[in-house]
């Protein structure tokens, strides 16, 4: 079930036409999903944390769910860590992007 946008405020930062999302990644799961657990976004992926596969899974999941180009998404902090900061660039309408984010996040 999607969450309310207000519940994402601790995990999201809007910087003009950029949006930064703090995500904790749990690799080698059964499926790909994004959950809100105790105020933190947690991405579960079926990919292992090898050769950037879990990172690519996260970027592709966000691109598809948020309807943005993969080239506009970058992991700006934590590429080799499970705690990451993902930046989405060239966001025309941050409020609409946050609504789309809320629609792909499950309650944890």
UniProtKB/Swiss-Prot annotation:
Provide the Gene Ontology terms for cellular component: cytoplasm
Cited InterPro entries: DUF167 (IPR003746), YggU-like_sf (IPR036591)
Concerning its family, UniProt says: Belongs to the UPF0235 family.
Q: Give the species.
A: Aeropyrum pernix (strain ATCC 700893 / DSM 11879 / JCM 9820 / NBRC 100138 / K1)
Name of the protein in its database record: UPF0235 protein APE_0182.1
Q: Which PANTHER family match?
A: UPF0235 PROTEIN C15ORF40
